[in-house]
Amino acid sequence: EKAKQVPTFTPLVRDLKVDRTLLFDALKKTHAWIDIDGPFDLGPGPRMSARTQSWAYELSRCMTCGCCFEACPNTGHANQFLGPAAISQVRLFNAHPTGKLNKQERLRSIMGADGITSCGNAQNCVRVCPKDIPLTTSIAQMNRDTTVQSIRNVFGSDA
């Protein structure tokens, strides 16, 4: 009886299966993948520093379970916040040598009203993440990166 009273943003499909459409829509909006086909000259295999590999590995452990999305008071149908998982994936893919080719596109996707500024810093996402991913660290870094991108946009710099 109590289980029926727990409020959720994601509709329950059946036991242990929820509709993660909002989460996947956020990942699509933020271009949370690396293009392997297209006009890019990929050249030799990309290299990452050991330091970058270390924190990128932590972010790559995300299994898109939606726990962070569900625990966040700023996500759901009433609020269009992209959620911590999508923002963390933007950081992950922007750090990848090949993923950097779409860095500006990803940053623009989190610069709107539903993006980085909608995070209320409740930090529920970190508390519930089953993989202990440092989501708030990613959100803080993406906040910095979007600020830098905004300045570049004002002055017309592509770098």
What function would you assign to each model-found segment?
Residues 5-159:
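Ferredoxin-type iron-sulfur electron-transfer modules in oxidoreductases and energy-metabolism complexes
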